[in-house]
């Protein structure tokens, strides 16, 4: 369990869960690659570790750091964001029902509908920008509510506190995927969520060189169940990946401010461009849930969505002519990324569902990096001129 402290997140990302190595004095947490640990006598542990799937010193340091950043008692890390999702889903039993926000990451929807549904779990996808659809979807069998806020890719925002209050009144558990905001800009546990999770691959690691996931909670019972599942399922990250994530985490506060600064500048440019139909960003007053954003977030992040005028031909032309923005899936790295969700991250979502959600062929998603803003704006401008 992580002990609470009074430090700000900019201090916790550097120090929480970490101390100088007792043997060498090294100020950086070592990469503990050993798969097994010495027992001085049969069944007697030399330390808290016996086998690296069950527990690892490098992994523990990362988990304690995340817990401190999310104002949580506990954190558990996994081999990917989807491994985190899979482990959480194992809290359920046959016949249980799950409500998910409709505009959810394509991989999450794919797992829910094409994998977990085969184990007699029922999933419904609803718009959670208001509580009406949530209340209508709830049944006596609803055990879990899963939200992303902001969502991927349309950046819709749910009122975490309002959702948590209703979910708890019905005896269910609320999970919030906080990947887009990171612990720096949003802390869902403080707003009533039972579990917060992240794809560490994104902003927490921040360097596009590590695939990992993590969850945090303040609930003792949930932690005990999830810790058992972490060990039993075994979808744990390698010590080296934990080291990379811990290293990336140290600059989270600096990076997130830079992402946000560049995102605002790009939004201001796009809103005035004649070839852009619409811009979506939580920090813009035009965002439908901007007031909720101001209430529950400390900032607005680096994800920007905009619609080009025309058809998929204009989208393809723009994306083929962009230079600094890498045309690639994923997000949250220091480098700027760009993608077309309808044929990339959300291609697994049926076309009729994409149309219903508003994920059109002219919707372009930006993961705004921390490069020089003038270079990024010049790149966007020249690509738009050619589409």
UniProtKB/Swiss-Prot annotation:
Molecular function terms from GO: cystathionine gamma-lyase activity; homocysteine desulfhydrase activity; L-cysteine desulfhydrase activity; pyridoxal phosphate binding
E.C. numbers: 4.4.1.1, 4.4.1.2
Organism superkingdom: Eukaryota
GO BP, sorted A to Z: cysteine biosynthetic process via cystathionine; cysteine metabolic process; transsulfuration
Subcellular location: Cytoplasm
GO cellular component: cytoplasm
Keyword Cytoplasm: yes
Pathway: Amino-acid biosynthesis; L-cysteine biosynthesis; L-cysteine from L-homocysteine and L-serine: step 2/2
Subunit structure: Homotetramer. Interacts with CALM in a calcium-dependent manner.
Protein known as: Cystathionine gamma-lyase
Organism name: Dictyostelium discoideum
Name of the coding gene: cysA
């Amino acid at each position: 369990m992580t002990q609470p402290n009074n430090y700000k997140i900019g201090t916790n990302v550097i120090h929480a869960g970490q101390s100088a190595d007792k043997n060498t004095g090294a100020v950086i947490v070592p990469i503990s690659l050993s798969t097994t640990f010495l027992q001085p006598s049969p069944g007697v542990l030399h330390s808290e570790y016996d086998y690296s799937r069950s527990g690892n010193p490098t992994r523990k340091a990362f988990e304690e750091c995340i817990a401190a950043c999310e104002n949580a008692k506990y954190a558990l890390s996994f081999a990917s964001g989807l491994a985190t999702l899979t482990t959480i889903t194992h809290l359920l039993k046959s016949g249980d029902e799950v409500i998910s926000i409709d505009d959810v990451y394509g991989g999450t929807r794919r797992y829910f509908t094409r994998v977990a549904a085969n184990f007699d779990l029922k999933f419904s996808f609803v718009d959670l920008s208001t509580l009406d659809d949530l209340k209508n979807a709830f049944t006596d069998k609803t055990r879990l509510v899963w939200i992303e806020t902001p969502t991927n890719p349309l950046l819709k925002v749910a009122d975490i506190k309002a959702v948590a209050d209703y979910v708890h009144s019905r005896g269910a558990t609320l999970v919030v995927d906080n990947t887009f905001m990171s612990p720096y800009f949003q802390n869902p546990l403080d707003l009533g969520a039972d579990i917060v999770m992240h794809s560490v691959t994104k902003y927490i690691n921040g360097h596009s060189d590590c695939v990992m996931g993590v969850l945090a909670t303040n609930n003792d019972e949930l932690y005990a169940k999830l810790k058992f599942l972490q060990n039993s399922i075994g979808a744990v990250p390698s010590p080296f990946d934990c080291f990379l994530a811990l290293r990336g985490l140290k600059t989270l506060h600096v990076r997130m401010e830079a992402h946000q600064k560049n995102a605002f500048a790009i939004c201001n440019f796009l809103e005035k461009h004649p070839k852009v139909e619409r811009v979506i960003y939580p920090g813009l007053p035009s965002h439908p849930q901007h007031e909720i954003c101001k209430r529950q977030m400390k900032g607005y992040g680096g994800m920007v969505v905009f619609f080009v005028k025309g058809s998929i031909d204009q989208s393809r032309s723009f994306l083929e002519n962009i230079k600094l923005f890498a045309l690639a899936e994923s997000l949250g790295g220091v480098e700027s990324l760009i993608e077309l969700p309808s044929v990339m991250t959300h291609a697994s979502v049926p076309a009729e569902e994409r149309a219903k959600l508003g994920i059109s062929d002219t919707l372009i998603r930006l993961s705004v990096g921390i490069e020089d803003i003038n270079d990024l704006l010049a790149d966007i401008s020249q690509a738009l001129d050619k589409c």
